């Protein structure tokens, strides 16, 4: 690709070559006031350009994230923002993300490159602590340790008629009152209090967990484009709700089945972490 600034050929999947990007970073650092003034004077023009070229920009971003360099920069920036140790080289990230997903076996493709997952979330990005991980597994796993993640997927697989096993490692959630839940949601909420209470008392649709021993199930909207209606809601524990995210029921269960059917060589000594989201 030809650099848009110096017109020299470079190998990065970016409009500007690395030397020119470094020059521009240093220039902008030294000329912050000029850069701010330029932005203010051209704000409307820039906004219109981004609006007119939205699809083009999204495709470019997708291609960049699918490149080894783009994936490396993304992971490195993510680690820096979370104050995590990062000791990986770009070559290592490229080789590791070429591997199939450690959890489900999904391959890296030209369109979508796998990312990295830290096996032990108390440790940063070092070679012995990272595995290749597809975007969906990474999003479903959140802050769980790998054993708990695989075991939960195994129970979901079993509950939906496939091979699997049950696990005791789930998070206990008390839930919210009808009024509090209704006031906090940003969607139209058409459920009555009686309907809401019935959903909370029923078993989780995805994993089968019962609302006992201080645990209360919640509600999942089957179609995330539709509001809280009786037809669109099912009983769902908090852990399955977070893991399912905005995925379809079919894709969520299929991913759990893929994970449950795969063998995993997980190192010993990793502490259990049953909460999916941790406060940092």
What annotation goes with each model-predicted range?
Residues 99-103, 112-121, 202-205, 215-224:
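Histidine-centered catalytic micro-motifs used for acid/base chemistry in nuclease
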Residues 1-110, 126, 135, 139-205, ...:
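Contiguous alpha-helical segments
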Residues 9-16, 115, 119-130, 218, ...:
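Short linker/helix segments within small regulatory modules
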């Amino acid at each position: 690709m030809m650099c848009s600034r110096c017109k020299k050929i470079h190998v990065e999947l970016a409009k500007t070559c690395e030397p020119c990007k470094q020059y521009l970073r240093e220039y902008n650092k030294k000329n912050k006031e000029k850069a701010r003034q330029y932005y203010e004077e051209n704000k409307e023009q820039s906004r219109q350009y981004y609006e007119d070229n939205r699809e083009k920009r999204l495709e470019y971003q997708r291609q960049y994230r699918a490149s080894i360099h783009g994936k490396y920069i993304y992971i490195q920036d993510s680690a820096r923002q979370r104050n995590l140790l990062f000791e990986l080289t770009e070559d290592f990230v490229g080789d590791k993300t070429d591997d199939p997903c450690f959890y489900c076996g999904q391959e890296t493709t030209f369109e979508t490159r796998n990312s990295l997952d830290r096996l032990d979330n108390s440790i940063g990005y070092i070679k012995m602590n990272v595995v290749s991980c597809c975007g969906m597994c990474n999003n479903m796993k959140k802050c769980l340790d790998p054993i708990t993640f695989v075991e939960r997927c195994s129970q979901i697989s079993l509950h939906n008629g496939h091979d699997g096993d049950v696990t005791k490692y789930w998070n206990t959630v008390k839930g919210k009152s009808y009024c509090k839940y209704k006031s906090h949601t940003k969607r139209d909420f058409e459920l009555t209090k009686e309907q809401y209470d019935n959903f909370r008392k029923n078993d989780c649709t995805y994993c089968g967990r019962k609302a006992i021993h201080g645990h209360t199930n919640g509600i999942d909207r089957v179609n995330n484009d539709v509001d809280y209606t009786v037809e669109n809601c099912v009983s769902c524990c908090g852990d399955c709700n977070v893991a399912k995210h905005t995925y379809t029921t079919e894709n969520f269960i299929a991913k759990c089945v893929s994970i449950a059917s795969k063998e995993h060589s997980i190192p010993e000594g990793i502490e259990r972490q049953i909460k999916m989201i941790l406060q940092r």
